[in-house]
């Protein structure tokens, strides 16, 4: 019996079966727990966390050392504007695709029209970067759930075939046909389309799920399908709540930015008022000093004139008395 091939984990270099390694990063279960994929606090891009205290990616860490703490971008409100008022992603997109437009999901002025190139990936919608990532996550999760349901459905089909292999071929074909009819009745194309419309981006699937084409026992397929439908509904609800939280955070950031701007203007007005008030006080003090000096000068002149008048009056009296003595 041939042994299955083993593949090395990219982190610890230990060998595991291919099914136990993660897609893309090729990490084992222990490394996925020790180094999870998280979002950067600043640029919101996903990166592999080296330590629990590391919350920003390497690129943002270098930018923080070089430029300091970033500011919210004036377009997407992501705290990643290290240089100027726009983040690097919006700056590059604006140079390549022109000014931003309104996102059809979050209604923010931060979506760049990539023409047919980007709209094909999001079902023809004009979405910003964050809403595009959320849209792709919903699609990926739904595809994974449908793949898991299809594999479990095929396993149950093989078991039912082994149990009923002693029955007549016509009877077995009749049971599989009835089971296939039950599955198709449980999940009609209209219900499947309505389930997708509940997602954030209202995506409509172009292909029917695999469980419509594979026969199995009717009871087990209906139970598994109801569980999958409930799980999909819960995931869509969680995704909607997450998007609402993100939009509320953006609104809070905008309000905080508005409040900070108003506080800055109020501080400038107060400083200007204090400066003008101090200037007026200085002018008043100078005017008072000048007035006092002028009054003192006038009073000194008056005193001098009074002295001169008194001296002149005394001289006239002396002259009169002398002339009276000289007369016979």
Swiss-Prot record:
GO CC, alphabetical: nuclear speck
Keyword Coiled coil applies: yes
Top-rank lineage group of the source organism: Eukaryota
Tissues where this protein is expressed: Highly expressed in hematopoietic and immune systems including in the thymus, spleen, kidney, and blood vessel.
Compositionally biased region (Low complexity): 148-159
Keyword field: Coiled coil, Phosphoprotein
Residues recorded with modification Phosphoserine: 188
Bias kind Polar residues: ranges: 185-201, 216-232
Start-end of Basic residues biased regions: 165-183
Entry coiled-coil feature ranges: 237-316
Keyword set includes Phosphoprotein: yes
Disruption phenotype: Increased mortality and impaired thymus development. No effect on blood vessel development but hbbe1 expression in 48 hpf embryos is lower than in wild-type embryos with recovery by 60 hpf, suggesting impaired early erythrocytic development. Significantly increased numbers of neutrophils and macrophages in an inflammatory injury model.
InterPro entries (alphabetical): FAM76 (IPR032017)
Region named Disordered: 143-232
Biased composition (Basic and acidic residues): 203-213
Family per similarity comment: Belongs to the FAM76 family.
Function: Plays a role in hematopoiesis and immune system development, and participates in the inflammatory response.
PANTHER family on file: LD21662P, PROTEIN FAM76B
Name under which the protein is recorded: Protein FAM76B
UniProt organism field: Danio rerio (Zebrafish)
Gene that specifies this protein: fam76b
């Amino acid at each position: 019996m041939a042994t299955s091939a083993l593949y090395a984990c990219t982190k610890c270099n230990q060998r595991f079966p291919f099914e136990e390694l993660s897609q893309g990063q090729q990490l084992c279960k222990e490394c996925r727990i020790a180094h999870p994929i998280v979002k950067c606090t600043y640029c919101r891009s996903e990166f592999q966390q080296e330590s629990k205290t590391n919350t920003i990616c390497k690129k943002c860490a270098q930018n923080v050392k070089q430029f300091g703490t970033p500011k919210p971008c004036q377009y997407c409100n992501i705290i990643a504007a290290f240089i100027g008022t726009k983040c690097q992603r919006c700056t590059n997109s604006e140079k390549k695709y022109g000014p931003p437009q309104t996102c059809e999901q979050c209604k923010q002025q931060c979506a760049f029209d990539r023409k047919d190139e980007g709209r094909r990936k999001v079902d023809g919608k004009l979405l910003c970067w964050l809403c595009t990532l959320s849209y792709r996550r919903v699609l990926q999760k739904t595809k994974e759930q449908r793949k898991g349901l299809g594999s479990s459905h095929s396993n149950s089909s093989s078991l039912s075939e082994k149990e009923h292999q002693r029955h007549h071929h016509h009877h077995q074909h009749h049971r599989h046909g009835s089971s296939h009819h039950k599955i198709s009745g449980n999940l009609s194309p209209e219900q499947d389309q309505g389930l997708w419309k509940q997602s954030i981006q209202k995506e409509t699937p172009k292909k029917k799920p695999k469980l419509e084409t594979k026969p199995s026992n009717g009871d087990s397929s209906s139970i598994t399908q109801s569980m999958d439908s409930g799980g999909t509904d819960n995931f869509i609800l969680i995704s909607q709540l997450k998007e609402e939280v993100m939009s509320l955070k953006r609104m809070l950031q905008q309000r905080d930015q508005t409040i900070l701007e108003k506080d800055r203007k109020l501080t400038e007005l107060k400083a200007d008022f204090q400066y003008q008030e101090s200037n007026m006080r200085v002018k008043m003090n100078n005017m008072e000093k000048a007035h006092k000096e002028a009054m003192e000068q006038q009073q000194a002149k008056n005193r001098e004139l009074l002295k001169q008048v008194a001296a002149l009056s005394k001289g006239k009296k002396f002259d009169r008395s002398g002339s009276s003595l000289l007369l016979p």
